[in-house]
Amino acid sequence: MRLLPTTVRRLVSYLVPLTRRVPSAYSGWLEITTWRGHKTLNTASANYSYGLLQQVLRYGLRFVPVADAAAPVLVLGLGGGSVLPLLRHEQGRTGPVTAIELDPAVLEVAATEFDVRSGPNLHIVCADAFAWLPAAPPSSFELAIVDLFLDLTLPTELGEAAFWQQLWRVLQPGGRALCNLLTTAELWPEGQPLPEFLEELGFAVQDIEVEQLNRLLILQRLA
C-alpha cells in the first residue's frame, strides 16, 4: 500500500495512530509510529528514539554542564537521532558530532523519517561501536553519549573492561560521558561492580536510577 502524503498522514494521526514497519537484522521489526503529529521510533519492546528514551537522555544531560559549546561530541548508538536536538537546541552545543550506529535499517529510518543525515557538523558512521572505538584518536571528545541497546538488551561488551578503558582514552581530560544502562543489568568488569571499576580507572562517577528500568552513569575523566 502506498504511503499517504506527509501532511495527510500527520492530520490522520490526530484521529488514529499510524505505524509503518521496517525489517531490521538486529532488532526484528522497527516501528515508526505517528500519533497526534508526533513521530517515534520503536521496536516491539522498546522505544528507540523520540519517546521515553529522549526524556531519559534529556534528564541525564541536566547533570552534564556545557564547558565548551564548540567542543566535539561522540554519540555511541545514534538510533533515530533524538539526542541531537537535545545537544543542539537545548544545550546549545555547536561543535562537531560523530555518531556511530550499528544498524543500517535504523540509519535509513533516521534519514527518511527524521531527516537525520551526515552533514557539515554531523558525521554518521555505520559501524559496531565496540570495534570502532579503539581506532578513534585519543583525547578527542569533550562529551560522549553511550546508548548501546539491542531492543531491551545491553551488549555483553559493556560488562568488559576494554570498552570502558577505550572510553576513558577517547575523552579529553575533564571530559564527560552520559551512559544509559539498565537497572536490571549486572555489569562486573574484571569482577568489580561497574561504578567501583570506573572510579579505579580514573572517572568520577554519578549513578542515577530513572524511569524504573533505566540507570544513568554520569562520568568525568579526572586526568
Regions found by a protein language model. Give the residues of each.
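N-terminal auxiliary segments of SAM/dcSAM-dependent transferases
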Residues: 1-40
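Soluble, non-transmembrane catalytic domains of enzymes that act on hydrophobic metabolites at membranes
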Residues: 23, 28, 42, 145-150, ...
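Short, basic/glycine-rich phosphate-binding loops at helix/coil junctions
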Residues: 35-44, 144, 176
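Surface loops and adjacent helix of pleckstrin homology
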Residues: 44-46, 112
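A short, flexible beta-alpha/helix-coil linker loop
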Residues: 46-48, 149-152, 184
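Loop/helix-junction capping segments adjacent to catalytic residues or to phosphate/diphosphate-binding pockets
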Residues: 50-51, 188
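The AdoMet/dcAdoMet-binding core of the Class I SAM-like
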Residues: 54-170, 192, 212-217
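C-terminal substrate-binding/active-site "lid" region of AdoMet-derived donor-dependent transferases
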Residues: 155-222
